[in-house]
Amino acid sequence: MTRLLRRLMLLSFLGHSFASFSQSNNDYVPCQEMPNLMQNFNADYRILIRFYTPTTGNTGGGRGGFGAPDAGVGSPEKRERLGKLYAGYIQKLEALNFNSLSQECKADYILFKRDLDEKVKLAAKEAAEYANIKPWIPFAEKIYALEKTRRRGKQPDAQKVAKEWFDITKEIKTMQGKLKDEKGISPDAVFEATESIADLKKAAGSVFEFYNGYDPMFTWWVPKPYKELDDALTAYSAAFKSKTADTKAVDKSGIVGQPVGREELVRQLNYEMISYTPEELIEIANKEFAWCDAEMLKATKEMGFGTDWKAALEKVKNTYVPAGKQPEAILKLYNESVDFLKKKDLITLPPLAEEVWGMRMMPPENQLVNPFFTGGADITISYPTNTMDEDDRLMSMRGNNPHFSRATVHHELLAGHNLQQFMNQRYRTYRTFGTPFWTEGWSLYWELLLWDLDFPQGPEDKIGMLFWHMHRCARIIFSLNYHMGKWTPQECIDFLVDRVGHERANAEGEVRRSFVGRYPPLYQLAYLTGGRQFYALHKELVGTGKMTNKQYHDAVMHLNAMPVEMVRAILTNQKLTKDFKTSWKFYKLPF
């Protein structure tokens, strides 16, 4: 708590106080009730998940230990206990006097209640999904019951355990035979089944590691039945996964995803406090695209290519640096961007943050889904390796040319993802309201702001920045159309190639990343949508002289992650009620 008691020196508002943010004598802890409640919940949540998630020695936690935090599938006992936790904290929250809270703590109340309600809904959904696949794991209760008594060290009847696990192994093989002929198992059911089987493997492994070698009778009776059970569970999981592999792609892309549908998109947008429909977001993206088109033609003409923007883009792509030179090029671009931020006095950059960011190289297999560099504590650089095919090497180099990279190094490092991570670990650390609309939106916002501040040095740099702006427009359009069932993955790939100018391999990687691996449906549209939220708030506060650039940017970083509408509510002192509903229209639609 010592860090939470330090006073935050945040705003000195050019001769006038800005009551919306300097509302308490202790700016770092805006009140005691909400930080304490959320910290206690987070601690309770972590310890319960740890206790009710089994693990084995080779997955952490020691022999027969507890698992890493994982709120996903698990035993019915685990879900029931978490449900009691949620209900208990909802009661504690409702006992607070909302109207007596400070503005920041009202925002915390609203967001914490939102998240508790969401956890209750998701828990009910997970219980239904588990019930759906429970007939395929009728032996689960026996394994979980033994793991439960293991937690308190009860000595088992070793001969009984051996017989039980032998019988379960036979049962699994019978079920696997039935599964082979089963038709119509959904990808969600396959995921639930494989995760449940993995949890059962951990539960059985936890029991075995706890007693084996320590309990003489267990050590004599159980090792062989355990090995056979573990192998059977592994094979059973693989059989479920093969049901997904058998699912045919809808087109030649080979990408098998699962559109969530418009209704679920609307529900998630409401949760993220985005007050636009999917169709309205597509309209916004098209309006942004039109602006990009006009600016791209200006830069193309300046480069001497008339109206042939794709020819200008090709020239920019071919400015790539030789193999082995990309890390040096990234460092040069980083220094240019940080020097620009400091010269314009745009944001406070802690010296330690500048000192400790690192570099990594992206493995070639990861470049299939991350064809460009990524950021965070380190910047991970995508560039070709000796193991890649010639075409893939050239596409990687062309797609990561200096003008493309110059537009986004600040997105990944300072003042983007690296600074976000650095500051979130130091300010308002009790908040756990992370959202891609804040995380990706903030980093994208800097691309918009630096364009306005003439960061690009010439038409090639402008084309690099416009390429990424168009890319983010395209993400909104293709991801929403896909999840509403209107586009196939191949149509999304073709759209990126034809409309944005992507290398085809990079476009395939982008679409695969978006739809495979259970990426959240709204993630890809969060970049430009969140960026426009921060841009609109900048116009509202900095554009009107209420804050300087530095004050605004520092304030956002000190608040920690949350929906941008709540950042606005805090910084502009918007009226907040317990039953708050999203309503902020941060972008003027074209109609």
Q: For each predicted feature, which ranges?
A:
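N-terminal maturation segment of proteins
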Residues: Q23-F591
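Bacterial Sec-dependent N-terminal signal peptides
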Residues: M1-Y28
